Amino acid sequence: MDSPINEINRIRNDRKCVLRSNEFLNRYMLEIDNKDLTTTSYVFSVPIFNITDGNLVNLKFSQENGCLHHTGSNADIIVRNNVVCLKNSCGIVHIEISKSEKEIGSNNMSMVNLSPTLNGVKLRKVINKEKFIKLNIDINETPYGIKFNEKYFSFMSHDITPIFTISVIGDRYIESFTPGSVVLNTKAIDDRHYEIYIECSDELKTVEVECNMYEQKLMLDTTVENRRPDENNLYGASAIIGSGEKYGEQWLFSKINYGIIRNILLKRIKSVRLFIPRLNKKVTEITAYNLMRRFCSIGTTWNNNDSRSTNTAKTVFTDSYYIIDITGFTVDSETQNFIEMLGFVLKPKCDGNSYSLISTGDCYDQPQILEITYYN
């Protein structure tokens, strides 16, 4: 995503849409008045406005004194030589990229390409013969703890809230991305210093990694998979939806954090659609199922999930998105008021060796977008 406004223009196929004034400064939301006297809110899964000055995050580096600078939604980011520094009120994190890489910069010719996200950086690296990336990370104060698996690593401020997360995305430039192609391994040096090794399979030509300071998210979600039935991907920025003999079946559970849209909760709602970015070319048909019971994004795994459902939602796809119409999950058909959704689960429609790589609610480079159209 190069700009939240440009992304909305692309979704609407409208280069001249006029934004409504953000009176309440909902940091996640852009609004547009429609010709039929309705208003559409585009709510991003992470904040798009800076917490201090209220300005829209500018997804471009500036240069000063030989460094790259970026101001995210609640963090300041500085890139000096091969070190990225991310700083906010919760902590200061340094990421040192292996010095064996000869070029580090913000242009596509570099071996390591860095670009700003909404609250951090995305690292894209051309895969070398060693087939791995090494990152040294440290934090200025001992964190409450850490959480990690083969998909992400997080410094935690307490049990469920990260300070900072590194998450592997994969290779967006190959036709079919499979689970297991990218693995994140962690080695502790001490309680503030860690080595991160991101190992890549032979099929990958490049790999992408997101490094972000945490913000509260709109979509509370996690993937579950039968290959690792006691794990989930709570803080990972990408999800793989699909099924296959070698890597098993993978689903995505999700629900709305209603506190983030409290300024429009009392409106009469016309429609609610969720735009989930597609991160690779492969299309796997998916279905959204409305859950009968509330799920916990923190503790849900393949072994303990309850995916019983009441109805399904229409899902279509474009070149950039899966679009899920969840109006029936979230709106009372008679009163047109919001009803609390217990959650939904995305599952592949058919069995077979097919996987799609998509963004989760923790993605700061290609965030999910909730489109809510309401009557004035």
Identify the residue ranges that each predicted region occupies:
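A short beta-strand element within beta-rich, extracytoplasmic domains
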Residues: 135-140, 150, 254-256, 265-281, ...
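Surface-exposed acidic, glycine-flexible loop patches that form ligand/cofactor-binding
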Residues: 260-267, 332-336
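Flexible, small-residue-rich N-terminal segments that precede or flank a structured functional core
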Residues: 194-261, 293-296, 348-351, 355, ...
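Beta-strand-rich interaction/scaffold domains
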Residues: 278-342, 363
